[in-house]
């Protein structure tokens, strides 16, 4: 049976036969205490534990001394321990400083079995540094055993390519040194991790700069949005003032008006009276007032247009631009006016003998557009989308006029049918 031990003096692990542990006869693989300190001989080959190799003379391997060590695992043979170490199944506890004491003994290291050596990396140290120090320890022991006189400037890595031709254990020495492949693999992994860390730091710095730029742009965008809203308010107020100064229609030459009749035609007079009765329109210029103010149960929409307060609140919960525009047109003009009007005053092309109807008041159409604009501006700030949705106002009002005329015709048919019965 073999034991995987860790010597406390140099924190190096070896796979040794259990016969190297003094006063230790395990009955199973779990019959040990990993917190207990055992006395272990270093150099199992010199103890003659192997049945096929006879014991050597003291002049060949020197006097062996006991060393303090911890047993980390037991196995039936060395290959099981090797597989457990490579698969990281053996947990190595932290080294306690209480176990490491100065005993005053002169330690003479014999030839170690280094075929399976596990280097425990201390916290905060690089893998290459740990392997480098372990190689230095191997060089020191080889100097003491073989009488080599290596200078302090000798690189520990030369042990991999240098060998002592006079020793009998040339093959065992090549197997005993820490595998160069393991050292190079650890070094490559460390360099790869350093490269990945450098890339991550560069990516982090690039992301931080992008966030700073986006924050600046967002701040500028917020300032532009506030400025645009302020300009919109000023534009609407300017439009109200201009519409009040111009009156209900386009500018008219006063000299022509005086030379012609002073009173409007009966048809126009009736039209003005209808609009006045339905939407409370005040054609006379009035002081500029803010929009959407309440007064005596009515809401001011601008340019002297007033609508019922209750109907206005019901309109605000209407879904969709089409329904909102149609209901607002009914509130401003009324169904009686809309059924006898057209949006632009141009006769339809569907009928050859169609007579054009009077157009709707341009300034009232502008009020409808402004109300719809205020509604859309609460949903989006995209000017392209706002312009696209506002361009459909005439279409919505035209559809409403057609619906009113259609319902009137259906009502007339029902009445005619009822009279015939």
UniProtKB/Swiss-Prot annotation:
This is BEN domain-containing protein 5. GO terms for molecular function: DNA binding. Pfam families: BEN (PF10523). Residues 302-408 form the BEN domain. The keyword Acetylation applies. The modification N6-acetyllysine is found at residue 133. The BEN domain mediates DNA-binding. Residues 180-243 form a coiled coil. Acts as a transcriptional repressor. There is a cross-link at residue 258 (Glycyl lysine isopeptide (Lys-Gly) (interchain with G-Cter in SUMO2)). One of its GO terms (cellular component) is Golgi apparatus. InterPro entries: BEN_domain, BEND5. Keywords: Acetylation, Coiled coil, DNA-binding, Isopeptide bond, Repressor, Transcription, Transcription regulation, Ubl conjugation. The keyword Acetylation applies. One of its GO terms (biological process) is negative regulation of DNA-templated transcription.
